[in-house]
Amino acid sequence: MESSIDGRTVSVKVKLHMGYAYENIRLGLYLLEDGLVYNQINSTPYYPEITRQGVWSDGSVDVIAFGFIHNDVLRHTFSNIFGDVVSGNNVGHDKVYTKEFQYSIPPNMKLENLKLVAFAADYEDRYIINSRESKIGETQDFEPID
């Protein structure tokens, strides 16, 4: 996976190197953001330092974790949520499939908190074959799996 940013436009190239001829393989790419701070309901004993009873804007009362930090928040899907179909001509032992994506990042997202997650999935069995995560601007080589 290779990515670069120009202004607020991110460009990503994802390569899928296959060791097996999957019948129905898909390639997906997500943009995630870390560090989003929002209140949320907390019905667990965790985070007692930020949890107390509170009132929502609609007047309802709840146990709220105030200022909870959300990480790995899905902000954009470059592909179909289940991944884009990799056509039969591109599937097979030792074949490499390449797909390029682009996205204009809205101003409400912090560039330094963004990361990419690419995955290869067997759509029929709903099975993730492999995945990679990287910051924008990083280049990663293939990661073989057995």
PLM regions: where:
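Short, conserved sequence motifs used for protein processing/export or organelle targeting and
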Residues: 1-146
